[in-house]
C-alpha cells in the first residue's frame, strides 16, 4: 500500500519540523555563552535552509514516488519537449493531482516534475507553455533567489528583534514569489510564444478556478491569481499588490 499524498505531506512536514528543531537545539547546546546562542541558531537556520532547498529533489520523490509507466503519455511528453528550444530533465509521475513544479536550488540539480493528472487535462499547446514556465524558473535561478532572500532575512532577524520586521519580511517574501511567477510567465512567452503560455494558464484556471475574493488577499499569496497572470501577459502590466 502506497500512502496517499496528504499522508506523505504530513509525515514530511513533521520530519522537517523535527530536523529544524534538532538543529536549533544542537546550536544552543554547542555554544555555552548565552550571548552567542542567537548567532549560533542563526547559522543553524541557514544550514537548515540550505539542506531544505538542496534536498528538494529527494523530497519530491518522496511525495510522488511512482513514476508513470503510461507509454502513450510518456511519448506525448517527449513530443512536446522536442518543441521547446531548451528544457530541463522532466519526470512524469502517476498521480491524480494536477500539478507541475520545479525543485533544486542550483540549475545543475534542478528537476521538473509533471503529474499524469495534469497532462490528462491540458492540451499539447498548454503543456508546452507550462513546461516553458518551469524551465524559466530554472534558467533565471528563481529558487536560488528565494533561498538567498530567506538567508538574508534570517541574518537580519538575528540583529533586529522586531514583530514589525517579521510582518514586513513575510509580505516582502510573498511579493518576491509573485514577481518571480510573472517573470516565469514572461520567460515562457519568449521561449514558446505568448499564445502557448496564455493557453496553459487558461487551462490551469479551468482546473483550478480563481476565487473572486482572491484579489483582495493577494498580499499574503505566493502566486498571483491566474486571471491576473493572463492579463499581465496580454497587457504587460504586473499587479503585485
Cite the ranges covered by each PLM segment.
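Short, membrane-interfacial amphipathic segments enriched in basic
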Residues: 124-128, 142, 220
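Active-site-proximal gating segments in proteases and membrane effectors
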Residues: 82-111, 174, 188-241
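Short pre-active-site segment immediately N-terminal to the catalytic Zn-binding motif
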Residues: 113-129
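Hydrophobic or amphipathic, alpha-helical segments that drive membrane association/targeting
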Residues: 1-95, 140-141, 153-163, 167-179, ...
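Active-site recognition of the HExxH zinc-binding catalytic motif
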Residues: 114, 129-142, 184-185
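Short, Lys/Arg-enriched, Gly/Pro-containing loop segments at transmembrane-helix junctions
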Residues: 66-69, 184-190
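Catalytic Zn2+-binding segment of zinc metalloproteases
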Residues: 135-151, 195
Amino acid at each position: 500500500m502506497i500512502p496517499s499524498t496528504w499522508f506523505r505531506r504530513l509525515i514530511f512536514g513533521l520530519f522537517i519540523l523535527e530536523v529544524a528543531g534538532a538543529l536549533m537545539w544542537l546550536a544552543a547546546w554547542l555554544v555555552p555563552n548565552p550571548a552567542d546562542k542567537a548567532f549560533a541558531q542563526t547559522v543553524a537556520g541557514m544550514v537548515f535552509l540550505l539542506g531544505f532547498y538542496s534536498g528538494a529533489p529527494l523530497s519530491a520523490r518522496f511525495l510522488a514516488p511512482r513514476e508513470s509507466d503510461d507509454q502513450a503519455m510518456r511519448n506525448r511528453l517527449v513530443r512536446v519537449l522536442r518543441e521547446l528550444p531548451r528544457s530541463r530533465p522532466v519526470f512524469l509521475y502517476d498521480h491524480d493531482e494536477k500539478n507541475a513544479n520545479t525543485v533544486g536550488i542550483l540549475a545543475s540539480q534542478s528537476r521538473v516534475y509533471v503529474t499524469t493528472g495534469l497532462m490528462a487535462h491540458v492540451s499539447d499547446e498548454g503543456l508546452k507553455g507550462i513546461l516553458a514556465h518551469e524551465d524559466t524558473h530554472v534558467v533565471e535561478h528563481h529558487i536560488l533567489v528565494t533561498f538567498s532572500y530567506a538567508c538574508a532575512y534570517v541574518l537580519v532577524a538575528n540583529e533586529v528583534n522586531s514583530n514589525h520586521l517579521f510582518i514586513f519580511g513575510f509580505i516582502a517574501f510573498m511579493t518576491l514569489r509573485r514577481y518571480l511567477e510573472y517573470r516565469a510567465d514572461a520567460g515562457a512567452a519568449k521561449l514558446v510564444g505568448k499564445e502557448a503560455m496564455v493557453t496553459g494558464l487558461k487551462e490551469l484556471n479551468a482546473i483550478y478556478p480563481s476565487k473572486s475574493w482572491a484579489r483582495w488577499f493577494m498580499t499574503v499569496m505566493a502566486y498571483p491569481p491566474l486571471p491576473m497572470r493572463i492579463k499581465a501577459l496580454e497587457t504587460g502590466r504586473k499587479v503585485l499588490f
